[in-house]
């Protein structure tokens, strides 16, 4: 998604010229493609088609009519809908070899300008002029366009694999192998190098994963040049323009100042390279705040070989060159430096990626495989939940039935055993109590009767008081008997 971060007046101020008659002031600034912004900004200009024909003289672009494009896309059928970007909806079509002489039969992608979208007539013209004159294996091929009344359409070669974004982040897609990822990074850098080193350098300004398209062989090609700008000319170090781009990819100095340079594209390339390494989006609001922005989360670990494994895409399943991964991480770190002057230029990036791509010595031996469900994830999830819930309900009912049955059986058995035991205990207790009662009664009667046979004298002797003992002692002394007390004193009486 393209976002306009800011639009300060002091950043974008085209030259103003007055007409001789002083009737009105018009803004006029030469574009990198030869047409004036006055012409580009006026979609109802009657000379627009003529201007395009003159500017694109010698190019092989075809000018289609609205009727022809309806035939190609089957009236823009919903079954041919491919997606939608900042420019507008994109439909798949097929050009028959009978449609026009010299135009071979081929599948195409038709992009329709949404007049209420984020991009408009200016971006349409920039796209046509740029891709109409620039040809490179790593730039998507523009076959033709339609500029009829208010209709603005672009016809491209069809890219069967879609965008890098869909290949990396779509849930049902197969993971890209390590070598394929390096090739994509290398080819995308080659396309960017072609723009930066052109006779009139061009700054891409919107380098991101969704703008890198892949053909059937996974060859990477840059697309969507609507935001492209002329590079600085002469002694100029940058281009001042309103800030437009995609959140998570735009260079920090460009966001803050509106100063655009080729190093701004290098920063954006570093973000895409980081996405290839980690398998994560540049901005993912589903993650925690610390991990939401990819650059802020991963940059501290790019220069640490011990921590590099933490950020590598787990879907690679360790099927990658550790040496190559370290070099690629170092390159991404250099591209993401805060100061533009310290970032490498794109030619250096291409050279480093060439070396990394050719280095395959320590890639683990084996075929890269990744098992995915045959059904779409949503269907698999729903089926799994249904299957999971069905046994769960059956198990629950069966368990309740078995539990209730067992509970009744246990309850009946327990009551029977309890009642039986209770009766046995009661009978045994009564028998033991009666037996013990009789024994206690008999023993008590015997013991009660026995002490009554003891003599009274013995009892008196056994249980006499001190006064009684002293009286008996006096009687004994008087009668002349030896006294125990006297004996204790050591004497006898004769």
UniProtKB/Swiss-Prot annotation:
Ranges where the record places region Disordered: 434-471
GO biological process assignments: defense response; negative regulation of immune response; protein phosphorylation
S-palmitoyl cysteine-type lipidated residues: 4
Protein induction: Down-regulated during infection by Plasmodiophora brassicae.
Residues with the Phosphoserine modification: 210, 240, 321, 384, 429, 444, 455
Cellular component GO terms, alphabetical: plasma membrane
GO molecular function annotations of the record: ATP binding; protein serine kinase activity; protein serine/threonine kinase activity
Basic residues compositional bias, start-end: 462-471
Consequence of changing residue 111 to A: Abolishes kinase activity
Protein name per UniProt: Serine/threonine-protein kinase PBL13
Organism from which the protein derives: Arabidopsis thaliana
């Amino acid at each position: 998604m393209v976002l306009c971060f800011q639009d300060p007046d002091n950043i974008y101020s085209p030259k103003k010229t007055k007409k001789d008659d002083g009737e009105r002031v018009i803004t006029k600034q030469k574009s990198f493609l030869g047409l004036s912004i006055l012409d580009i900004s006026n979609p109802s200009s009657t000379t627009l088609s003529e201007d395009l024909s003159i500017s694109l003289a010698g190019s092989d672009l075809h000018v289609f009519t609205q009727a022809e494009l309806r035939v190609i896309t089957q009236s823009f059928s919903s079954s041919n809908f491919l997606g939608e970007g900042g420019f507008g909806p994109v439909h798949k079509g097929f050009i028959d070899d009978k449609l026009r002489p010299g135009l071979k039969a081929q599948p195409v992608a038709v992009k329709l300008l949404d007049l209420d979208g984020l991009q408009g007539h200016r971006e349409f013209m920039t796209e046509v002029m740029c891709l109409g004159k620039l040809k490179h294996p790593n730039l998507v091929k523009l076959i033709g366009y339609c500029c009829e009344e208010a209709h603005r359409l672009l016809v491209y070669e069809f890219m069967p694999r879609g965008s890098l974004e869909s290949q990396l982040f779509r849930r049902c897609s197969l993971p890209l192998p390590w070598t394929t990822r390096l090739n994509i990074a290398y080819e995308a850098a080659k396309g960017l190098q072609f723009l930066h080193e052109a006779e009139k350098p061009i700054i891409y300004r919107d380098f991101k994963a969704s703008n890198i398209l892949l053909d059937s062989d996974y060859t990477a090609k840059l697309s969507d040049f609507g935001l492209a700008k002329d590079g600085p000319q002469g002694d100029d170090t940058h281009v001042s323009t309103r800030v437009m781009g995609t959140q998570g990819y735009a260079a920090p100095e460009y966001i803050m100042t509106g100063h655009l340079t080729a190093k701004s594209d290098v920063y954006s390339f570093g973000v895409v390279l980081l996405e290839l390494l980690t398998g994560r989006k540049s901005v993912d609001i589903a993650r925690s705040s610390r991990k939401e922005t990819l650059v802020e989360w991963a940059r501290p670990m790019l220069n640490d070989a011990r921590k590099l494994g933490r950020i590598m895409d787990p879907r690679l399943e360790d099927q990658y060159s550790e040496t190559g991964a370290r070099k690629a991480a170092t390159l991404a770190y250099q591209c993401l430096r805060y100061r533009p002057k310290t970032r490498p230029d794109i030619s250096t990036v291409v050279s480093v990626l060439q070396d990394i791509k050719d280095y395959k010595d320590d890639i683990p031996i084996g075929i890269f495989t990744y098992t995915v469900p045959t059904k779409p994830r949503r269907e698999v999830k729903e089926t799994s939940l249904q299957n999971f819930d069905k046994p769960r309900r059956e198990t629950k009912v069966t368990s309740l039935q078995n539990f209730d049955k067992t509970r009744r059986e246990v309850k009946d058995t327990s009551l029977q055993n309890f009642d039986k035991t209770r009766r046995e205990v009661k009978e045994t207790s009564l028998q033991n109590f009666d037996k013990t009662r009789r024994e206690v009664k008999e023993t008590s009667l015997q013991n009660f009767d026995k002490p009554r046979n003891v003599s009274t004298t013995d009892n008196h002797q056994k249980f006499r008081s001190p006064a009684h003992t002293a009286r008996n002692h006096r009687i004994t002394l008087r009668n002349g008997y030896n006294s125990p007390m006297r004996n204790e004193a050591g004497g006898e009486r004769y």
